[in-house]
């Protein structure tokens, strides 16, 4: 039986009519009497976890009459103190979205392409989809080609260790590819190269007196949004908040001062601030040290003898000054940043005078040369002694978890051999150091997978699975992904919505939603506390959906066992026993539950948490009811006492940590570090490669032909790219400053619009070096002249009838500007470039 796309939509519409219009809500209700008035006293609050952004807030859902009707933050959470942000409410519409994929489906049109109807039809008999997938994997094993299996990950839980990690190894492939390099990897290098921490920072907002929100919007995106919303006014009352961004975001609109910097000139501003702090003698003597004679010898343009300075907890302050900072004056920076000299001097002085109760909270900085920019920014946190100080910033707290069972005894020789092959994303090659944790080849180069697939370099891929990912939409120059996935012979997509990537799937498996339908464990941190929180089903499933990381693993293992490869099933059956009863799992749901119990055991088992200093629970039922375990509060200055996890055990202005990684990468590829810099498109040569230094912007498009810099911004309503089919997303779009409800717009400064003869609401053609898009113009003073800003999220031709203009005909609603942004990278980290105005565009009336 074949179902055309429009017939599939008609079926969805029938469910939607029941969900939206029926007075009895009989798709969900336990009785046919209809819904009575709902009072606050009715129902039960069930804890789970929101994963709409990278905060991962513990939340609760009010369950009334078999319907999840309300959401709020978990009152026991010390990360958000019971507060939540606006995007969480969209979970209600996501759960009951009539356009969700409801049953496993298969492709019947062998031709793949963006404009090709896949002609999907549902599996009606048994579980044939699992037979098909298992057959493809067995074929790889038979031909000793297990390395040609690829798993691509989007949003995930701790259980990704099972599906993304261990399952891939059991099959025999090195190719588990994370989405993280199109998310926020560059910012991690700022703290990694200076203080040895590869991760997101935490902030002591309760005691902070001066906050610079730099290229990020803590009130809308990035991390710990509810905590920032609740506490930013306190920072302003005690001192000052400054926002650095080419566009007035939510934080900038709240802050006492907004610095509309030119795109990609972040490093210049940071270095000029360092110059001011150093020449004025405002650096932290307690943390950095001082001249032996007590006299400041740092004078603009003049070098200093290293032996004259006695450093304490830092490495290379004088070398950094001599090589770079001495010439980076505010006067120089004013010319390249667009921020006047007096403002640079004043803000730098204010920041240092508030130390150590100050911090720079910086964002992704996903620019082609972003690693060195974030090193410059984070160096300021060290220069004033704010790192690991009360009122400043820190690495944050971890949270308890127990280990997953090991796979070693179950991984056979075929799998071991296959897993030793190179990864498909080309990490570790000369042009992609991809230095996660400053070690070559330990990062990921997500967006480059498309090019690797097209070139079959290092080899071709024959079987691919993707879950909670939509790289054809979320990756820059997405047309590459269209061509690449069209080449893959067999692709399975595990998602809740029919996305742009799903168009290329041979089998579509409907995914359970993390927050309301699945079992999982989530760990995160905010507000100086770490936490482990639960995800659990809060309503009975309406559709034939499965938890990807657990249930799909089990169902696939069952089929592989039936076909003669029983290792995977034996691993799951023997090792994932219920830690309370010792019972072996007998089906996919039991496995999901037991895996969650195993991972969280240290949270709820009185024996395992006996020595834990944070929250203590009394049994699994207690964890299900409370939903969270909070860590103790972070203790400051432990690294001051014990040392930083860098090569020198100090905060590094001259990064021996980065130097070690770059030298290792150069040696592996039989070149010099200078040749690495050249191959990866950085300007640094010699010692500059090891210090925070200025790199001029790398821009696609000559300024004369493409005069405007494109600013890619994020909506406070985006839920990991899967919320645009919610009507509330569009109804409240103006909560993103400068945007318009029910519209997708390009923000243009009125002064620029006047020169172009463009009026409010005009349709404009936006052209880059790789293509053009048409979108509605929005005239707004909140975007810097010479820049245009577009919010990521809209422009779907898939996802559903709200998200697309015409879902049946695959007509997009709005424009996805990833389609005209070239595929480029910060190659030290492997991160995709999307920030810093690296794409030049020209604007014309359509």
From Swiss-Prot:
Catalytic reaction list: arsenite + A + H2O = arsenate + AH2 + H(+)
What is expression of this protein induced or repressed by? Answer: Fully induced in the presence of arsenate.
What is the annotated signal peptide range for this record?
1-29
Q: How is the cofactor bound, as the UniProt entry phrases it?
A: Binds 1 [4Fe-4S] cluster.
Q: List positions binding arsenite.
A: 155, 179, 200
GO MF annotations, alphabetized = 4 iron, 4 sulfur cluster binding; metal ion binding; molybdopterin cofactor binding; oxidoreductase activity
Domain 4Fe-4S Mo/W bis-MGD-type, residue spans: 43-99
- Other comments on record: May also use zinc as a cofactor.
Question: Whom does it interact with, and what assembly results?
Answer: Heterodimer composed of one large subunit (ArrA) and one small subunit (ArrB).
The name on file for this protein is Arsenate respiratory reductase molybdopterin-containing subunit ArrA
Species assigned in the record:
Chrysiogenes arsenatis
Gene from which the chain derives: arrA
């Amino acid at each position: 039986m074949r179902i055309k796309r429009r017939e599939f939509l008609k079926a969805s519409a029938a469910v939607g009519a029941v969900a939206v219009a029926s007075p009895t809500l009989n798709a969900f209700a336990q009785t046919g009497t209809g819904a009575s008035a709902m009072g606050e006293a009715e129902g039960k609050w069930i804890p789970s976890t929101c994963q709409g952004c990278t905060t991962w807030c513990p939340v609760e859902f009010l369950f009334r009459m078999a319907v999840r009707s309300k959401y709020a933050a978990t009152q026991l959470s010390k990360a958000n103190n019971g507060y939540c942000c606006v995007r969480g409410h969209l979970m209600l519409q996501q759960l009951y979205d009539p356009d969700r994929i409801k049953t496993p489906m298969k492709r019947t049109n062998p031709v793949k392409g963006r404009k090709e109807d896949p002609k999907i039809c549902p599996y009606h008999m048994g579980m044939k989809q699992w037979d098909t997938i298992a057959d493809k994997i067995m074929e790889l094993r038979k031909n000793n080609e297990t390395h040609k299996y690829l798993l691509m990950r989007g949003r995930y839980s701790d259980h990704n260790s099972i599906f993304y990690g261990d399952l891939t190894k059991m099959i025999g492939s090195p190719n588990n590819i994370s989405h993280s390099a199109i998310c926020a990897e560059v910012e991690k290098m700022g703290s990694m190269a200076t203080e040895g921490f590869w991760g997101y920072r935490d902030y002591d907002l309760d005691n902070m007196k001066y906050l610079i929100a730099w290229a990020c919007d803590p009130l809308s995106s990035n991390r710990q949004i509810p905590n920032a919303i609740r506490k930013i006014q306190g920072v302003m009352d005690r001192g000052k908040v400054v926002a650095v961004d080419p566009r007035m975001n939510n934080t900038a609109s709240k802050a006492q001062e907004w610095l509309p910097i030119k795109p990609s000139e972040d490093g210049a501003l940071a270095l000029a601030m360092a110059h001011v702090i150093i020449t004025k003698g405002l650096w932290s003597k307690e943390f950095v040290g001082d001249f032996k004679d007590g006299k400041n010898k740092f004078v603009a343009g003049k070098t200093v003898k290293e032996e004259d300075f006695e450093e304490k907890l830092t490495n290379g302050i004088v070398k950094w000054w001599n090589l770079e900072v001495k010439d980076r004056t505010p006067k120089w920076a004013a010319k390249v940043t667009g921020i006047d000299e007096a403002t640079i001097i004043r803000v730098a002085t204010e920041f240092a005078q508030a130390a150590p109760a100050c911090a720079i909270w910086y964002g992704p900085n996903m620019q082609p040369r972003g690693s060195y920019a974030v090193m410059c920014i984070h160096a300021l946190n060290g220069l004033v002694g704010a790192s690991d100080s009360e009122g400043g910033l820190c690495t944050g707290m971890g949270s308890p978890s127990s280990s997953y069972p090991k796979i070693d005894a179950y991984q056979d020789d075929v799998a071991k051999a296959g897993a030793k092959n190179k990864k498909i994303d080309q990490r570790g090659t000369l042009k992609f150091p991809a230095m996660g944790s400053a070690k070559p080849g330990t990062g990921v180069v997500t967006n480059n997978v498309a090019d690797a697939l097209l070139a079959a370099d290092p080899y071709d891929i024959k079987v691919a699975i993707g879950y909670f990912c939509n790289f054809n939409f979320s990756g820059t120059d997405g047309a590459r992904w269209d061509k690449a996935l069209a080449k893959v012979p067999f692709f399975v997509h595990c998602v809740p919505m029919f996305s742009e990537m799903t168009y290329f799937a041979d089998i579509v498996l409907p995914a359970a939603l993390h927050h309301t339908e699945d079992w999982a464990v989530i760990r995160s941190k905010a507000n100086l506390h770490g936490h482990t929180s639960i995800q659990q089903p809060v309503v009975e499933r309406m559709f034939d959906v499965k938890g990807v990381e657990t249930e799909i693993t089990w169902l696939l293992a069952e089929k592989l066992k039936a076909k003669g490869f029983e290792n995977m099933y034996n691993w799951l059956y023997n090792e994932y026993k219920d830690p309370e009863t010792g019972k072996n799992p007998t089906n996919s749901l039991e496995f999901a539950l037991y895996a969650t119990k195993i991972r969280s055991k240290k949270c709820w088992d009185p024996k395992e948490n006996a020595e834990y200093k944070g929250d203590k629970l009394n049994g699994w039922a207690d964890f299900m009811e409370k939903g969270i375990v909070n860590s103790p509060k972070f203790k400051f200055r432990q690294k001051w006492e014990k040392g930083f996890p860098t090569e020198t055990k100090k905060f590094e202005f001259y990064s021996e940590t980065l130097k070690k990684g770059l030298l290792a990468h150069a040696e592996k590829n039989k070149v010099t570090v200078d040749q690495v810099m050249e191959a990866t498109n950085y300007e640094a040569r010699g010692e500059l490669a090891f210090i925070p230094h200025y790199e001029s912007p790398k821009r696609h498009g000559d300024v004369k032909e493409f005069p405007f810099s494109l600013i890619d911004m994020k909506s406070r309503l985006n839920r990991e790219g899967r919320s645009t089919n919610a009507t509330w997303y569009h109804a409240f779009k103006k909560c993103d400053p400068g945007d318009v409800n029910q519209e997708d717009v390009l923000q243009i400064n009125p002064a620029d619009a006047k020169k172009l003869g463009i009026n409010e609401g005009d349709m404009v053609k936006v052209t880059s070096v790789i293509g053009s898009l048409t979108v509605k113009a929005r005239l707004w003073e909140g975007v810097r002249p010479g820049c245009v800003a577009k919010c990521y999220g809209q422009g779907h031709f898939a996802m559903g009838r709200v998200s697309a203009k015409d879902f049946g005909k695959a007509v997009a609603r709005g424009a996805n500007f990833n389609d005209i942004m070239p595929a480029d990278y910060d190659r030290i980290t492997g991160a995709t470039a999307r920030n810093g105005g690296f794409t030049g565009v020209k604007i014309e009336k359509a």
